[in-house]
Amino acid sequence: MKLVFTGGGTGGHIYPALALAESFRKKGDEILYIGSNDGLERRIVPEEGFDFQGIEVAPFPRNLSVHLFSSLLKTGRGFIQARKLLRKFKPDVVIGTGGFVSGPVVLAAALQKIPTVIHEQNAYPGLANRLLAPFVTRIALNFKEADRHFKEKAREKIEITGNPIRERILTTSREEGLLNLGLRKGKKNILVFGGSQGAKNINEAMIACYRYFKNNSKLQIIHLTGMRNYQEVLQDLKEKGLDPSKYTQYKIMPYLDNMEWAYAVADLVIYRAGATGLAEITAKGIPAILIPYPYATGNHQEHNARSLEKAGAAIVIKDSELKGHKLVKLIEELINDGKRLKKMAQSSKRMGKPWARNTLINLIEDTAKGS
């Protein structure tokens, strides 16, 4: 079988596609990934060993502005490029996982009568998937409540599948993670990240944590700052006399391609609340402190976070209320309360859907066969 995957802009759209693509590659199927020339996927996808073709696309402005015409023009060129790539590759099915690049690719496939599947990770669907819904063959959702944002006719195509997780996230051992990250055994490990783009407020709050925990020999921190804020975080720490090179218990990096190592060792995660990251966290059963991104479409990140909080798997702090001293206090409370941390981990594990990848694979195969 020949499959085209498309989706990008952030890791939240890219990694679900890669989780599925990995499984189909193991079956001997032929994969092509179509992404943006300017997106994160342009680097990540080839590094994972998949054929990648870039097209021209631009996000639509949320409000009417002078940028709308240029976005339409660029996306129109991307549509023509996608159509040519599809005619040449002749896929049996096209799968879109969101982000503005998926729009022209999936639409071009649908208009060529190629079976199409879109996957929506969030409780509030992204613009691309809402616009594509009338044209596609099937719609896969992570959250059941997302279906109310689609028109009635589109709802007939919906299946609740969960969010696909890369196999190595599920199988990597703690020992392997410790070895690859250069961390010591027998300590509590905290993973801090704000998604593939980073999170400035979380980074700033962590400065207070580094100062407070610098002499705590029982704690290790893996902090992924995001590319944009990495140098700023290092400089800030050095100015406060906390040169990271002198503190081996702190692993501060702009980004980590091998997230399976970090998840494998984490006893607590501090994160935004993107759906893909939450799917990975719950599949591993890791307790979390969540700081939802306040400007996400439809405030979907807070909705995502509150669902974990309600289940007892996470504690939620609003971005506007995030302060360094507050984060320090919460970390200390959790790390020193083994029973509470264990209970949160159990709740997190119950929320996980490690089987989601297989459900989606079956849906995609059925769609390609026309059943």
Curated annotation (Swiss-Prot):
It comes from the Bacteria. It catalyses: di-trans,octa-cis-undecaprenyl diphospho-N-acetyl-alpha-D-muramoyl-L-alanyl-D-glutamyl-meso-2,6-diaminopimeloyl-D-alanyl-D-alanine + UDP-N-acetyl-alpha-D-glucosamine = di-trans,octa-cis-undecaprenyl diphospho-[N-acetyl-alpha-D-glucosaminyl-(1->4)]-N-acetyl-alpha-D-muramoyl-L-alanyl-D-glutamyl-meso-2,6-diaminopimeloyl-D-alanyl-D-alanine + UDP + H(+). One of its GO terms (cellular component) is plasma membrane. GO terms for biological process: carbohydrate metabolic process; cell division; cell wall organization; lipid glycosylation; peptidoglycan biosynthetic process; regulation of cell shape. It holds the Pfam family Glyco_transf_28. InterPro entries: GlcNAc_MurG, Glyco_trans_28_C, GlycoTrans_28_N. UDP-N-acetyl-alpha-D-glucosamine binds at residues 10-12, 122, 166, 196, 301. It is a peripheral membrane protein. Pathway: Cell wall biogenesis; peptidoglycan biosynthesis. Belongs to the glycosyltransferase 28 family. MurG subfamily. Cell wall formation. Catalyzes the transfer of a GlcNAc subunit on undecaprenyl-pyrophosphoryl-MurNAc-pentapeptide (lipid intermediate I) to form undecaprenyl-pyrophosphoryl-MurNAc-(pentapeptide)GlcNAc (lipid intermediate II). This is UDP-N-acetylglucosamine--N-acetylmuramyl-(pentapeptide) pyrophosphoryl-undecaprenol N-acetylglucosamine transferase. It comes from Halothermothrix orenii (strain H 168 / OCM 544 / DSM 9562). The lineage of its organism: Bacteria, Bacillati, Bacillota, Clostridia, Halanaerobiales.
